[in-house]
Amino acid sequence: MATEVSQLLLAVVQGIPAGATNDDLTKALPDVPAATRVEALNILLQEGGIEILKKGEKLVYRAKDPEKKSALPKDADNEEKVVYGIVEEGGNKGIWIRDIRMKSNLNMIQLNKILKNLETKKLIKAVKSVNASKKKVYMLYNLEPDLSITGGAWYQDQDFEVEFVDVLNQQCLRFLQMKRDSAEKKREGPLAFKQMSCCTVNEVQKFISDLGISKVNLAEADLETILKTVVYDGNAERVRQQDGSFVYRAVNAPLPPTGLVQMPCGICPVIKNCSNCGDVTAITCEYMRDWLD
Protein backbone atom coordinates (compact mmCIF):
# COMPACT_ATOMS: atom_id res chain seq x y z
CA MET A 1 0.00 0.00 0.00
CA ALA A 2 2.68 2.51 1.03
CA THR A 3 4.76 1.72 -2.07
CA GLU A 4 1.81 2.44 -4.36
CA VAL A 5 1.01 5.64 -2.48
CA SER A 6 4.65 6.75 -2.75
CA GLN A 7 4.37 6.77 -6.55
CA LEU A 8 1.18 8.84 -6.35
CA LEU A 9 2.87 11.27 -3.97
CA LEU A 10 5.89 11.53 -6.26
CA ALA A 11 3.61 12.50 -9.15
CA VAL A 12 2.01 15.21 -7.00
CA VAL A 13 5.39 16.59 -5.88
CA GLN A 14 6.73 16.59 -9.44
CA GLY A 15 3.74 18.69 -10.46
CA ILE A 16 4.73 21.43 -7.99
CA PRO A 17 8.30 22.53 -8.90
CA ALA A 18 8.51 24.96 -5.97
CA GLY A 19 7.79 22.14 -3.55
CA ALA A 20 4.65 20.59 -2.08
CA THR A 21 3.54 21.07 1.52
CA ASN A 22 1.66 18.54 3.62
CA ASP A 23 -1.52 20.50 2.87
CA ASP A 24 -0.90 20.09 -0.87
CA LEU A 25 -0.44 16.34 -0.47
CA THR A 26 -3.56 16.03 1.69
CA LYS A 27 -5.66 17.90 -0.87
CA ALA A 28 -4.29 15.83 -3.76
CA LEU A 29 -4.84 12.49 -1.99
CA PRO A 30 -7.62 13.05 0.56
CA ASP A 31 -8.44 9.34 0.91
CA VAL A 32 -4.90 8.35 1.98
CA PRO A 33 -4.50 8.04 5.78
CA ALA A 34 -1.89 10.30 7.40
CA ALA A 35 0.15 7.34 8.66
CA THR A 36 0.30 5.81 5.18
CA ARG A 37 1.27 9.15 3.67
CA VAL A 38 4.14 9.56 6.15
CA GLU A 39 5.34 6.02 5.43
CA ALA A 40 5.21 6.68 1.68
CA LEU A 41 7.14 9.94 2.08
CA ASN A 42 9.84 8.13 4.05
CA ILE A 43 10.14 5.60 1.23
CA LEU A 44 10.64 8.41 -1.31
CA LEU A 45 13.19 10.11 0.95
CA GLN A 46 15.16 6.89 1.40
CA GLU A 47 15.10 6.19 -2.33
CA GLY A 48 16.25 9.74 -3.09
CA GLY A 49 13.18 10.54 -5.17
CA ILE A 50 12.40 13.69 -3.21
CA GLU A 51 14.17 16.08 -0.88
CA ILE A 52 12.81 17.84 2.16
CA LEU A 53 13.24 21.57 2.72
CA LYS A 54 11.98 24.00 5.29
CA LYS A 55 10.25 27.25 4.34
CA GLY A 56 9.30 29.24 7.40
CA GLU A 57 7.44 26.92 9.75
CA LYS A 58 6.43 24.43 7.05
CA LEU A 59 8.19 21.42 5.56
CA VAL A 60 8.28 21.32 1.77
CA TYR A 61 8.85 18.24 -0.38
CA ARG A 62 10.52 18.76 -3.74
CA ALA A 63 11.26 16.26 -6.51
CA LYS A 64 14.96 15.58 -7.10
CA ASP A 65 16.70 15.37 -10.43
CA PRO A 66 17.12 11.62 -11.13
CA GLU A 67 20.57 12.28 -12.61
CA LYS A 68 21.66 14.20 -9.53
CA LYS A 69 22.94 11.89 -6.84
CA SER A 70 23.20 13.14 -3.27
CA ALA A 71 26.14 12.24 -1.06
CA LEU A 72 23.87 12.37 1.97
CA PRO A 73 23.48 8.91 3.56
CA LYS A 74 20.01 7.37 3.62
CA ASP A 75 20.00 7.20 7.43
CA ALA A 76 20.30 10.99 7.76
CA ASP A 77 17.47 12.57 9.75
CA ASN A 78 15.12 15.22 8.36
CA GLU A 79 16.97 18.15 9.95
CA GLU A 80 20.26 17.05 8.38
CA LYS A 81 18.54 16.74 5.00
CA VAL A 82 17.11 20.24 5.33
CA VAL A 83 20.47 21.79 6.26
CA TYR A 84 22.33 19.81 3.59
CA GLY A 85 19.83 20.97 0.96
CA ILE A 86 20.25 24.61 1.98
CA VAL A 87 24.06 24.35 1.85
CA GLU A 88 23.81 22.63 -1.54
CA GLU A 89 21.77 25.53 -2.91
CA GLY A 90 24.57 27.91 -1.90
CA GLY A 91 26.84 26.39 -4.56
CA ASN A 92 30.54 27.21 -4.59
CA LYS A 93 29.94 30.69 -3.17
CA GLY A 94 28.77 29.14 0.06
CA ILE A 95 26.18 30.35 2.53
CA TRP A 96 26.49 32.12 5.90
CA ILE A 97 25.38 30.27 9.02
CA ARG A 98 22.92 33.11 9.69
CA ASP A 99 21.20 32.45 6.35
CA ILE A 100 21.12 28.70 7.05
CA ARG A 101 19.47 29.38 10.41
CA MET A 102 16.86 31.68 8.84
CA LYS A 103 16.02 29.22 6.06
CA SER A 104 15.97 26.14 8.27
CA ASN A 105 14.29 27.85 11.24
CA LEU A 106 16.49 25.81 13.59
CA ASN A 107 17.94 27.17 16.83
CA MET A 108 21.69 27.82 16.93
CA ILE A 109 22.51 24.94 19.29
CA GLN A 110 20.72 22.42 17.09
CA LEU A 111 22.11 23.93 13.87
CA ASN A 112 25.71 23.93 15.13
CA LYS A 113 25.36 20.27 16.07
CA ILE A 114 24.03 19.36 12.62
CA LEU A 115 26.76 21.35 10.85
CA LYS A 116 29.39 19.66 13.01
CA ASN A 117 28.00 16.21 12.12
CA LEU A 118 27.95 17.01 8.40
CA GLU A 119 31.52 18.33 8.58
CA THR A 120 32.67 15.20 10.43
CA LYS A 121 31.12 13.05 7.70
CA LYS A 122 32.93 15.21 5.10
CA LEU A 123 29.66 16.15 3.44
CA ILE A 124 30.15 19.90 3.88
CA LYS A 125 33.04 22.18 4.78
CA ALA A 126 33.52 25.63 6.28
CA VAL A 127 35.57 28.13 4.27
CA LYS A 128 36.81 31.54 5.42
CA SER A 129 36.00 34.41 3.09
CA VAL A 130 38.52 37.11 2.21
CA ASN A 131 35.67 39.64 2.41
CA ALA A 132 35.04 38.83 6.07
CA SER A 133 37.86 36.86 7.67
CA LYS A 134 35.98 36.34 10.94
CA LYS A 135 33.02 34.73 9.19
CA LYS A 136 32.77 31.35 7.53
CA VAL A 137 30.61 30.14 4.68
CA TYR A 138 29.50 26.55 4.27
CA MET A 139 29.49 24.60 1.01
CA LEU A 140 29.51 20.99 -0.14
CA TYR A 141 32.75 19.19 0.66
CA ASN A 142 33.69 18.39 -2.96
CA LEU A 143 33.25 21.94 -4.29
CA GLU A 144 36.09 24.32 -5.13
CA PRO A 145 35.35 27.73 -3.55
CA ASP A 146 34.59 30.62 -5.89
CA LEU A 147 37.33 33.23 -6.44
CA SER A 148 35.18 35.81 -4.68
CA ILE A 149 35.58 33.70 -1.52
CA THR A 150 39.26 32.74 -1.72
CA GLY A 151 40.55 35.88 -3.45
CA GLY A 152 42.29 33.78 -6.08
CA ALA A 153 46.04 33.44 -6.49
CA TRP A 154 46.79 36.70 -4.69
CA TYR A 155 45.63 35.51 -1.27
CA GLN A 156 47.16 33.04 1.15
CA ASP A 157 45.20 32.22 4.30
CA GLN A 158 43.02 35.31 3.71
CA ASP A 159 46.10 37.58 3.55
CA PHE A 160 46.93 39.56 0.41
CA GLU A 161 50.37 38.52 -0.90
CA VAL A 162 51.86 41.97 -1.56
CA GLU A 163 55.43 40.74 -2.13
CA PHE A 164 54.28 38.00 -4.51
CA VAL A 165 52.31 40.50 -6.60
CA ASP A 166 55.27 42.91 -6.67
CA VAL A 167 57.61 40.16 -7.89
CA LEU A 168 55.17 39.18 -10.64
CA ASN A 169 54.80 42.82 -11.64
CA GLN A 170 58.58 43.20 -11.94
CA GLN A 171 59.03 39.97 -13.90
CA CYS A 172 56.19 40.74 -16.30
CA LEU A 173 57.70 44.16 -16.96
CA ARG A 174 61.15 42.58 -17.43
CA PHE A 175 59.75 40.21 -20.06
CA LEU A 176 58.07 43.08 -21.93
CA GLN A 177 61.32 45.07 -21.84
CA MET A 178 63.29 42.05 -23.10
CA LYS A 179 60.84 41.75 -25.99
CA ARG A 180 61.21 45.45 -26.78
CA ASP A 181 65.02 45.35 -26.60
CA SER A 182 65.06 42.35 -28.94
CA ALA A 183 62.86 44.20 -31.43
CA GLU A 184 65.10 47.30 -31.27
CA LYS A 185 68.19 45.29 -32.19
CA LYS A 186 66.57 44.04 -35.41
CA ARG A 187 66.11 47.62 -36.74
CA GLU A 188 63.34 46.76 -39.21
CA GLY A 189 61.41 50.03 -39.09
CA PRO A 190 58.89 51.56 -36.68
CA LEU A 191 55.87 49.44 -37.69
CA ALA A 192 57.79 46.17 -37.50
CA PHE A 193 59.35 47.28 -34.20
CA LYS A 194 55.95 47.95 -32.67
CA GLN A 195 54.59 44.62 -33.83
CA MET A 196 57.62 42.59 -32.68
CA SER A 197 57.72 44.27 -29.27
CA CYS A 198 54.15 43.17 -28.44
CA CYS A 199 53.49 40.15 -26.21
CA THR A 200 50.40 38.05 -25.73
CA VAL A 201 49.21 37.03 -22.28
CA ASN A 202 49.97 33.43 -23.20
CA GLU A 203 53.63 34.31 -23.87
CA VAL A 204 53.89 36.05 -20.50
CA GLN A 205 52.24 33.07 -18.80
CA LYS A 206 54.80 30.68 -20.30
CA PHE A 207 57.67 32.96 -19.23
CA ILE A 208 56.43 33.15 -15.62
CA SER A 209 55.80 29.40 -15.57
CA ASP A 210 59.34 28.67 -16.80
CA LEU A 211 60.78 30.92 -14.07
CA GLY A 212 59.14 28.75 -11.42
CA ILE A 213 58.54 31.67 -9.05
CA SER A 214 54.92 30.76 -8.35
CA LYS A 215 53.83 27.85 -6.19
CA VAL A 216 50.29 28.09 -7.54
CA ASN A 217 49.13 27.59 -11.10
CA LEU A 218 48.52 31.04 -12.58
CA ALA A 219 45.86 31.28 -15.27
CA GLU A 220 45.99 33.77 -18.13
CA ALA A 221 43.34 35.85 -16.37
CA ASP A 222 45.62 36.14 -13.31
CA LEU A 223 48.56 37.36 -15.36
CA GLU A 224 46.40 39.75 -17.34
CA THR A 225 45.51 41.36 -14.01
CA ILE A 226 49.23 41.84 -13.31
CA LEU A 227 49.86 43.19 -16.82
CA LYS A 228 47.13 45.76 -16.30
CA THR A 229 48.92 47.00 -13.17
CA VAL A 230 52.07 47.42 -15.29
CA VAL A 231 49.99 49.51 -17.69
CA TYR A 232 48.53 51.59 -14.85
CA ASP A 233 52.08 52.23 -13.59
CA GLY A 234 52.85 53.82 -16.98
CA ASN A 235 55.43 51.17 -17.92
CA ALA A 236 53.46 49.42 -20.67
CA GLU A 237 50.56 49.90 -23.04
CA ARG A 238 47.63 47.64 -23.90
CA VAL A 239 46.97 47.33 -27.63
CA ARG A 240 43.74 45.98 -29.07
CA GLN A 241 44.08 43.59 -32.01
CA GLN A 242 41.71 43.22 -34.97
CA ASP A 243 40.27 40.01 -33.52
CA GLY A 244 39.36 41.80 -30.28
CA SER A 245 42.21 40.34 -28.20
CA PHE A 246 44.85 42.44 -26.47
CA VAL A 247 48.64 42.43 -26.49
CA TYR A 248 51.06 44.31 -24.27
CA ARG A 249 54.29 46.17 -24.98
CA ALA A 250 56.77 48.02 -22.79
CA VAL A 251 57.03 51.78 -23.19
CA ASN A 252 59.65 54.25 -22.06
CA ALA A 253 58.84 55.92 -18.78
CA PRO A 254 57.48 59.45 -19.28
CA LEU A 255 59.81 62.37 -18.58
CA PRO A 256 59.39 63.91 -15.13
CA PRO A 257 57.39 67.17 -15.16
CA THR A 258 59.28 70.44 -15.04
CA GLY A 259 59.36 72.56 -11.92
CA LEU A 260 57.12 75.19 -13.53
CA VAL A 261 54.34 72.63 -13.96
CA GLN A 262 54.68 71.41 -10.40
CA MET A 263 54.40 74.85 -8.78
CA PRO A 264 51.04 76.69 -8.63
CA CYS A 265 52.23 79.40 -11.04
CA GLY A 266 52.40 76.86 -13.87
CA ILE A 267 48.64 76.34 -13.91
CA CYS A 268 47.45 79.66 -12.42
CA PRO A 269 44.68 81.19 -14.61
CA VAL A 270 45.53 84.78 -13.51
CA ILE A 271 49.32 84.61 -13.77
CA LYS A 272 49.26 87.51 -16.26
CA ASN A 273 47.97 89.78 -13.51
CA CYS A 274 50.53 88.62 -10.93
CA SER A 275 53.08 91.19 -9.73
CA ASN A 276 55.02 92.28 -6.64
CA CYS A 277 52.13 94.47 -5.51
CA GLY A 278 48.36 94.53 -5.80
CA ASP A 279 45.76 91.89 -5.04
CA VAL A 280 47.35 89.18 -7.22
CA THR A 281 50.85 88.56 -5.87
CA ALA A 282 52.94 85.57 -4.87
CA ILE A 283 53.56 87.22 -1.49
CA THR A 284 49.97 86.66 -0.33
CA CYS A 285 49.05 83.71 -2.61
CA GLU A 286 47.50 80.96 -0.48
CA TYR A 287 48.23 78.33 -3.16
CA MET A 288 51.93 79.21 -3.10
CA ARG A 289 51.92 79.06 0.69
CA ASP A 290 50.29 75.61 0.72
CA TRP A 291 52.74 74.36 -1.92
CA LEU A 292 55.75 75.57 0.06
CA ASP A 293 54.42 73.99 3.24
Swiss-Prot record:
GO terms for cellular component: RNA polymerase III complex. Component of the RNA polymerase III (Pol III) complex consisting of 17 subunits. The keyword Chaperone does not apply. Transmembrane segments: none annotated. Pfam families: RNA_pol_Rpc34 (PF05158). It comes from Drosophila melanogaster. Keywords: DNA-directed RNA polymerase, Nucleus, Transcription. It is found in: Nucleus. Belongs to the eukaryotic RPC34/RPC39 RNA polymerase subunit family. The gene is Polr3F. DNA-dependent RNA polymerase catalyzes the transcription of DNA into RNA using the four ribonucleoside triphosphates as substrates. Specific peripheric component of RNA polymerase III which synthesizes small RNAs, such as 5S rRNA and tRNAs. GO terms for biological process: transcription by RNA polymerase III. The lineage of its organism: Eukaryota, Metazoa, Ecdysozoa, Arthropoda, Hexapoda. This is DNA-directed RNA polymerase III subunit RPC6.
